[in-house]
Amino acid sequence: MQRRPVCDFNPDKSPAIYRGRTWPKPTGRVLSFSDAQLDGLQPVYFLEKKTTVNLGGVGVTLDPAQLGRQYLEKADVITLQAIKDQLGKRPVYFSRTVGPYADQFGLTEYLEGQGFVRKLHQDAIAESDSIKGIQGLGFVNVPRTEALAFQVYHGDTAARHRPRGWVDRPSEGILATYGIVYQGLAQLLQKRNPQEAARALVLADSIFKNTNYGFVPPPER
């Protein structure tokens, strides 16, 4: 991550929603750490008590009770340092495949869900016509997630019937992420676009049938 060169982004070869604008190319390393500092990072750092630190203008809570452990791992330190160094300079996203990882640092109110990722903001997020909160997914940018779900992601492929289910159990969580996002989108679209909500719900149902997670219909609103 530190040494990998930053490649140019070509909007013309990307999905349509990314075209028609200029994408600034980040410069410099992701972390301000020197190579010696990186090499010197310890496997774990013990947390004696709950602590709040300011990283790039965002208050991050280091709470053993929230983390479920009384220490930070090296990966946690690198993640937090990247936030400190890059928030406001580079976009910072958390994949939904990491589950509640970012929430364990008290970042829930700063995270805007966009499909399979959650974008970290410097200011707390408030609900609006386009951003809605939903249990299990946090704040979701509904128009953006809808565009990604139906114009970019391969939902039909994920929902394809598999007689033996998803045979590669270690990667099943990726397929489940499709199901969770489409299920949440169905709930968010129930009132504003019932037809698309039904489409998302059918996809979620078909996707979950290929997994061991099962399917739980979203509550009526």
Regions found by a protein language model. Give the residues of each.
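ER/secretory pathway lumenal C-terminal domains and tails of membrane proteins involved
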Residues: M1-R221
